């Protein structure tokens, strides 16, 4: 605990009684620090990301308005994120308040008091825009469609996804079951570091594809390049692309608090010669030049010289009717360099059969390639996740390789 410092620390009840109900806005420099937000790092130690006032407010307001096609006075908007996560900062607090948004703010679990909780809220308040994470969509899938089907969700006109790549199976379920087959889905790519949405379909403009991030927003410049910084060709299927941002954007991070060296090494060193920001994510362009995010580069496995994305293998596993959620890691293998180890959660009421593991391996081989067939598949009740819903593959890799677990401070349930 931090010791009390007289003169610095104040009791809430002592200050609030004398506080004025009126507030007069004060001007600040555009580069005035706005907040520091800690995000999980691949090395285990969280990074303090610094954002500043002017550019951050500009881009959160712009993206909230355009990506969600927000209409003040007509829409009821609900972003389900935790306010302490960047999505909550940008798309519950700053963006919506700037745009005069009528919104739902909910604190609690999606299954308390029952698994109908979110759908009760959508129905009761006539939610029109619903922005959530793939991990929650997969949870809804695991519970079964009979729960959303029991509700009138016809008020919904736009669905959003954030936090990690959404696999095509979950995307289709989200659109068909929650969106009744008629709502656009904006699958948004951005990071704590970028401050606001960078890559996303635009409703009414972009013909979306299940699982694809599609194109950078107007004013944003992104490329997919190989290890040498050369453009990746359209339709190259192996996970050989790196997502880089080659032009500045308003809400970009200004540094890692107290650690300029780590700031340089993490984001700028990889493509220092070109002066590009390296997002740490793998990506590919399909034959239409649409952009697909393949997850963290440290989540790209090298199997017998073939680079295979964890996101692709996870999508292949979840496409099997018995699987609600999957996480895949590359574990050291004496023969192939890395071997694929998968952890899967079964859908509700599914019992494992003697052939299930073999069936799943066959499914992956059929969907991707025999090279992508997992070496091991473990059926588990839960997956380790950060408080923002991201699967902590680093911990799964430690488990797969029999190592001691590293820093678990950002875990939901250490």
Model-predicted segments: where are they?
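Conserved pre-ATP/AMP-binding loop-to-beta segment of ANL
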Residues: 4-38, 45, 69-76
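Conserved S/T- and glycine-rich ATP-binding loop of Class I adenylate-forming
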Residues: 33, 39-42, 64, 77, ...
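Adenylate-forming
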Residues: 46-48, 59-67, 119, 137-144, ...
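Conserved AMP-binding/adenylation subdomain of ANL enzymes
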Residues: 57-76, 86-128, 142-146
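Gly/Ser/Thr-rich phosphate-binding loop
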Residues: 77, 94, 98, 128-132, ...
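Active-site glycine-centered loops adjacent to acidic/histidine catalytic or metal-binding residues
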Residues: 82, 163, 190, 214, ...
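AMP-binding/adenylate-forming catalytic core of the ANL superfamily
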Residues: 123, 130, 249, 254-255, ...
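Conserved ATP/PPi-binding loop(s) of AMP-dependent carboxylate-activating enzymes
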Residues: 215-219, 230-270, 308, 404
């Amino acid at each position: 605990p931090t010791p009390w410092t007289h003169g610095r620390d104040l009791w809430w009840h002592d200050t609030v009684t004398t506080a004025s109900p009126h507030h007069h806005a004060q001007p600040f420099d555009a580069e005035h620090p706005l907040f520091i937000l800690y995000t999980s790092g691949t090395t285990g130690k969280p990074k303090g990301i610094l954002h500043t006032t002017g550019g951050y407010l500009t881009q959160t307001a712009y993206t909230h308005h355009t990506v969600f096609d927000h209409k003040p006075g007509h829409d009821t908007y609900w972003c389900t994120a935790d306010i302490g996560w960047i999505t909550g900062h940008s798309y519950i607090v700053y963006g919506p308040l700037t745009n005069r948004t009528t919104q739902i703010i909910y604190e609690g679990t999606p299954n308390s008091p029952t698994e109908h909780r979110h759908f009760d809220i959508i129905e009761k308040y006539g939610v029109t825009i619903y922005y959530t994470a793939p991990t929650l969509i997969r949870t809804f899938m695991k519970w079964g469609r009979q729960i959303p089907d029991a509700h009138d969700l016809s008020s919904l006109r736009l669905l959003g996804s954030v936090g990690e790549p959404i696999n095509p199976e979950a995307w289709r379920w989200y659109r068909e079951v929650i969106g009744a087959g008629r709502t656009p889905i904006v699958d948004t790519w951005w990071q704590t570091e970028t401050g606001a949405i960078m890559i996303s379909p635009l409703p009414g403009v972009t013909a979306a594809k299940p699982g694809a991030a599609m194109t950078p927003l107007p004013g944003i410049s992104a490329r997919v390049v190989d290890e040498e910084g050369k453009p990746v060709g359209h339709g190259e299927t192996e996970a050989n692309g790196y997502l880089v941002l080659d032009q500045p954007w308003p809400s970009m991070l200004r540094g890692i608090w107290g650690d300029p060296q780590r700031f340089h090494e993490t984001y700028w060193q990889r493509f220092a010669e070109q002066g590009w920001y390296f997002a740490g994510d793998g990506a590919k362009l399909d034959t239409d030049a649409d952009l697909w995010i393949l997850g963290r580069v440290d989540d790209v496995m090298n199997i017998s010289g073939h680079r295979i994305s964890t996101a692709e293998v996870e999508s292949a596993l979840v496409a099997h009717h018995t699987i609600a959620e999957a996480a895949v890691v590359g574990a050291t293998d004496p023969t192939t360099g890395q071997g694929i180890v998968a952890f899967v959660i079964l859908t509700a009421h599914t019992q494992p059969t003697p052939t299930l593991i073999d069936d799943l391996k066959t499914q992956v081989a059929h969907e991707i390639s025999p090279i992508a067939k997992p070496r091991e598949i473990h059926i588990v009740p839960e997956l380790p996740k950060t408080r923002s819903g991201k699967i902590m593959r680093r911990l799964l890799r430690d488990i797969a390789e029999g190592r001691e677990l590293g820093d678990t401070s950002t875990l939901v349930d250490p």
